[in-house]
Amino acid sequence: MATTKKRNSSVVHMLVAMLVLFVPVVLVTQLFTRNPEPPITPIDWQPVAQRAAAEASYEVLAPTNLPEGWVATRARFTPGGQSTTGGGDPAPGDTFQLGFLSPEQRYFALDQRDVAPEAFVTAVTRTGRPDGEGAAGGRTGARYVSEDGRTRSLVARDGDAATIVSGDLPYEALEAFASTLAPVG
């Protein structure tokens, strides 16, 4: 009986010793192997917007008078028939895209295109379904919510052109951003 107690005691002591060594190793490993998030690099979106306004067949919109702390993170204009950055299929129409990060680190996207509005709306809204009415770019349009309920979009159409403001945000935040949109030029 005494031998069993001694053997069990040795096993317990060995497990405690292993735990004492293992926990600091795990903590040190976690501390030194974390990859910090890369800093957000602001971009100058105005030249892209000016080019889009000069070449697109629709009225190009962009935000004006955004409060301090907003950072542009994406600006792209792809003329119809040209491949997007990184190759791939050519854009079906003139496509303008802007992305901004708010001071609260929330991403707002502005997308415009003048061809195949149904396919464009489906892609940008993440296969969203209509969810009432809202305003985008000074125009009344439709609200869309993605299948998973996470992404909301405001869609305004003018003929074959579509303007979409989207983000993983409440409609009120999207409408506030959309209210800053004005024609470029």
Summary of predicted features, one role per range:
Residues 1-73:
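Charge-rich, low-complexity N-terminal segments
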Residues 11-21, 28-29, 66, 98-100, ...:
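Generic hydrophobic secondary-structure signal
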Residues 43-149:
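Short, solvent-exposed recognition patches
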Residues 129-185:
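A short, solvent-exposed beta-edge/loop patch
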